[in-house]
Amino acid sequence: HLNFRTVRFETEALDTPNYQGNAVVNYTEREVPYTRIIEHKHFEMFGQAVYDNPKTVISREYSTEWKEGMEPYYPVNDDRNNRLADEYRALAAAERNVIFGGRLAEYKYYDMAPTIESAIRAFNAEK
C-alpha cells in the first residue's frame, strides 16, 4: 500500500487575547516539534466580539507516521511510493465511469484551490 503521513492536534485555551496575530503560522525548523500553530479567532468569519475576548484558543499540529485506522493526510514522496502510485494510476485509467481525485486518489499534496481546480478539470474531461 501507499504510505502517508498524518497529523495530530493539541488544542489549548490561553489567557491572552492574542497569541500570534495570525490564523496560521508554519514552523519549518527541525528543532520545533510541530508544523504549525492555528489561532482560531483570527479566521475572519468570527467578528469583533471574538477579537475582544481576553482569551484565545490555539491548536498545534504535529506531523506523524500514519498507521492503520488513522486519517491519511500527506503522501510520502519517495521512489517506492511514487512508483506504486504510478501503478495505481495505470489501473485507475483503465476504469470506466469512475473519477479518482484529490490527495488520496492522485497521491499528491494539494492546497484547497488546486484541489478544486483539479476536480473541475476531471469533471470537464468526462463531458
Language model features with spans:
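C-terminal catalytic lobe of FAD-dependent flavoproteins
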Residues: 71-127
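Mid-domain catalytic core of redox enzymes
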Residues: 1-91
